[in-house]
Amino acid sequence: MSIPERFLALGDSFTIGTGTTPERSFPAVLADIWRERGRVIALTNPAVNGYATDDLIQEELPLLAAIRPTLVTLLIGANDLVRGSTEDRYRSQLVRIHERIRADAPDARVIALPQPDWSLAPAGAAFGDLDTTAGRIERFNAIAREEANRAGADWVDLFPLMREQGRLGSFPPDGLHPSEEAYAAWARRLAEIAS
């Protein structure tokens, strides 16, 4: 009998699968793909719609010590951006998150991901000027990539795929979050890159 890989998916609405169901979130679909390939995966997805880095630090990171994950995915930042976080504050929060992951799960493989370009969503205009929002998303993603690299985490750049999905209008009725098909495409790409 194989020892299960312990997969902890940290994040916000894009991780829990808002716009579909948690069972169709990208971590759940990714775990299913790996199971189909014979891997034994125990997934924990504590992500919550609306979470920012403060919430992740307070509510999700304590699970590291209990779960002792062998794999961690990290996708966080959209709500920091919406709440007006500065780039410096976002960076310092990511440093704290990566340090805590390394301290509490030193042997885990960490895969950091970008946030999608939600400025392309039908509801994107509700958050301000679309060009300004798109530029901030790109800067936040650059910071996330830099801090992932600095921490020794893997950066999987799904942003080109995510942006193409946005341009094609791959949104559920909420007009903001990715569709079930979009999340599944993220999972398939991750399965190709991060096996």
Residue ranges and their predicted role:
Residues 1-49, 59-68, 184:
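Serine-esterase "nucleophile elbow" of acetyl-processing enzymes
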Residues 23-26, 53, 137-140:
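Conserved donor sugar-nucleotide recognition element shared by glycan-biosynthetic enzymes
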Residues 17, 52-55, 80-83:
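Short active-site-adjacent helix-start/loop capping segments
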Residues 58-195:
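Alpha-helical cap/lid subdomain in secreted, periplasmic
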Residues 48-53, 132-133:
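Short, flexible loop segments at the rims of nucleotide/cofactor-binding pockets, characterized by
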